[in-house]
Amino acid sequence: MKRFSKFLIMAFASLFVFANAYAQDLGEATEVYNNAATALSEGNDNDALAGFQKALSLAEAAGEAGAQLATECKGIIPKILVKIGKEAANAKDLDGAIAKFKEAIAKATEWGDAETASEAKELIPLIFITDGNQLLNEKKFAEAIVEYEKALAEDPDNGMAYLRIGMCKNQLGDAAGAIAAFEKAMTLGQEANAKKQLVNVYVKKANADLRAKNSQGALDNAKKSLEYGENPNAYMIGGTAAVALKKYDDAIELLSKAKANANVNYNLARSYEAKGNSAKACEYYKLIAADAKLGEFAKAKVAALCK
């Protein structure tokens, strides 16, 4: 009986020491947590992060008694990681920013903070796009494409990345690649911006065809450009090409919408004359009668047609 009583005393003593150790862990965890909260309020984010991480470790060591404090730490650590990542990005430390965002994603996912994980995931491709934009502004188009492709590796449905890739490829003379990128961007929330870019791509192609005396190519690309939006140059190039092809209905339709100048008026006059509409031809020849280059020819036409 004495031996049994001695065993109980020893057992109770062990429990007291064990419980006391838990209490000490929780007390220290609470103190560290409060210090971390103070650091955070003072803008010392790195000190705050280290403090909350230590408080979490101590709270978990305290077992069930520290469960609530551990939950509090898990709720704030991913958010601090995102905040530090943003600060790194603002300081142009892009690698450091991405590392913090990825750490935030891992912790937030592990601890069930879907909102913070989602925010961090959205920020990573934005970092690559920002870097790409800097290179684009410096006319380092190939290097910029590399950064935009990194953004797509993180977010395959990033319409802005496709839009910027298209802009870079257009500058590099890769019209086919630019068109493919812009068409993809159109399906991913960048329709208006992508259409503006496609207008320019096809106008550029049409102008190159016109200079190369490929009138059919110039007309086709000008019309393709106009499928995406209005452009005065597309009307002028397409109309000029149509005159060369003797497609006078197309010429009149396009040139009537082009910005008026001597060449546009001349080609409209020719087109109406070819269609047998002397009155309209005369109207446009009169508009260029005073032109230094076309005036004498126009005056002769006016004399012949305007009776």
Predicted regions: what they are:
Residues 41, 83, 90, 130, ...:
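Register position in tetratricopeptide repeats
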